Amino acid sequence: MKDILVVGKLKEGKFEKFMGFNNSEEGMNERRKIADVTKSLGTVSPDKSAVMFKIVVHDEDAMYSFLDGSNPVSKPIFDEVMESYEIFELNKI
């Protein structure tokens, strides 16, 4: 398992749609395929234009698929709400 930080830039006015999907049963099922959701930490910028999640990933390929649009479940939502994202691997010191 790896600690990963994902920073996502959202399209204007799409925060609620993004969070609605992430917290839906469908979104949670996809997220469980990627990471231990009980260990996920998230935050949002004050203007709701960006989100940041620290996740404990157990399937990196599924994570990339979830974010890059090749996952058929997340693709329609992410095409609508996501402007860009960055992924960082975290190392404990």
Predicted regions and their residues:
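Short S/T/G/P-rich N-terminal loop/turn motif that feeds into the first structured element of a domain
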Residues: 1-73, 83-93
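Short, exposed beta-strand-loop hairpins at the edges of beta-sheets
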Residues: 77-79
